[in-house]
Regions:
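Alpha-helical solenoid repeat scaffolds of the TPR/TPR-like class and their adjacent stem/linker regions
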Residues: 1-326, 331-402
């Protein structure tokens, strides 16, 4: 970030001397973009492209800037122009996929999404067995393998029962913390943790390729909720303070490895606007470093029960969520877990959210129990929490009347 900040005056001086130097406009635009100064970036992309429209990489970056402003159709046009100039351009196809998916065009979006395997940071698995094409393979053994984050695995494991109808034996390779939870998903014959020796199989498919293979549209998303459940053997019990009428689980930070994490995660202090609502007990669903933020809350830390020492895997988290009335979370695996369990969950979204939450709607076709609270401008969490506080107070009032 510091290098981009230092580069801005250099490129500005260059343009003062040579205002028609397209590459300087592109470099300045990129530096502004990396500083989240999106309007300045867009202005210089436009000036530079008017001078030289032949760089596919610039159309790609311009599209990303437009998407960050919520101008999705303009962004799609930029990605398509980048592909016109350079048809075999994996990053442009990938960005186009994410934009089409966010727009709700799942068939075309998931078709383009297959280009992810051409990206340098996303190499495909090298199996001798063929990729499954979606056809009926009764009697065959299929391997479904997780490929991205924990939330992705929870979201797309919903396809296991559909695959089971077409194949004889379903093996799922997934992240170790999910193994016990996924034993409750129907259609799975065998679970293997990532890194363990795989059993014999005939065909394979990555989990996030299943919507493409099965021709999913917005209208045909398999959303039979719940499709995971709390294992019956689990006995983790929540303590509720005296006078508690409503139990709410909260999560405010996702994985720091996610490239969008600085936009989707937030400071725990924002939740303090909810802590004065009487009759509500709050439970932290965070694990590891974000849970340490609780000690900085001062007076408010008494309002939140820190469960991090009890949450060893997703079965533990599922046992807690099952006892809650509501989950309020940023876009993280907790949102997917609560949604897959059918628990009411309010998901707090940044202005340009992940593709799966679409745009301009409060509901999710993936999770019927989800309600979406969106930023109305980039970085504006204050208005989001004002709406959440109002909605939580109204929900409590409704519950008291029942």
């Amino acid at each position: 970030v510091g290098k981009h900040e230092q580069a801005i005056p250099f490129f500005q001086r260059t343009l003062a001397l040579a205002p028609n130097f397209a590459e300087a406009h592109f470099n300045l635009a990129s530096a502004f973009q990396n500083q989240d100064k999106i309007e300045d970036a867009i202005a210089h992309y436009q000036r530079g492209l008017a001078l030289n429209p032949s760089y596919p990489e610039v159309h790609l970056n311009f599209g990303a800037a437009l998407k960050a402003q919520g101008r999705l159709e303009d962004a799609i046009a930029c990605y398509q122009q980048a592909i016109t100039l350079k048809p075999d351009y994996p990053k442009a196809h990938y960005n186009l996929a994410l934009a089409l998916l966010q727009h709700g065009d799942l068939p075309q979006g998931f078709t383009e999404y297959e280009w992810r395997w051409q990206l340098p940071h996303h190499p495909p698995r090298n199996f001798s067995q063929p990729l499954w094409d979606g056809s009926n393979l009764q009697g065959q053994r299929i391997l479904l393998h997780a490929e991205q984050g924990l939330g992705d695995t929870i979201q797309f494991i919903r396809y296991a029962p559909l695959v089971a109808r077409l194949c004889g034996y379903v093996i799922v390779e997934c992240q170790a913390p999910l193994i016990q939870l996924l034993t409750t998903v129907s259609g799975i014959n065998q679970l293997v943790a990532q890194g363990e020796t795989l059993p014999q199989f005939d065909v394979h498919v990555p989990l996030l390729s299943l919507p493409h293979r099965l021709g999913t549209t917005l209208e045909t998303i398999p959303a039979q909720i719940p499709y995971v459940s709390q294992p019956a053997s689990h006995h983790l019990k929540l303590d509720a303070p005296q006078g508690t009428q409503f139990k709410v689980g909260i999560a405010w930070a996702g994985s720091p490895k996610n490239p969008n994490n600085r936009h989707r995660s937030l400071d725990l202090a924002y939740f303090s606007t909810l802590f004065d609502i009487p009759g509500v007990a709050f439970y932290s669903l965070q694990k590891e470093s974000p849970a340490a933020e609780l000690v900085r809350l001062g007076d408010y830390k008494e309002r939140i029960q820190d469960l991090s020492n009890q949450l060893h895997n997703f079965t533990d988290t599922a046992a807690v969520v099952a006892q809650l009335d509501l989950v309020i979370t940023v876009d993280t695996s907790v949102a997917h877990l609560a949604g897959a369990l059918g628990k009411p969950v309010w998901v707090l979204l940044n202005f340009d959210p992940d593709w799966r939450w679409l745009l301009g709607r409060e509901t999710s076709p993936w999770y019927p129990s989800v309600r979406l609270f969106r930023q109305d401008s980039p970085g504006n969490w204050q208005d989001v929490f004002a709406r959440v506080a109002e909605s939580l107070s109204a929900l409590l009032a409704d519950n008291l009347q029942k």
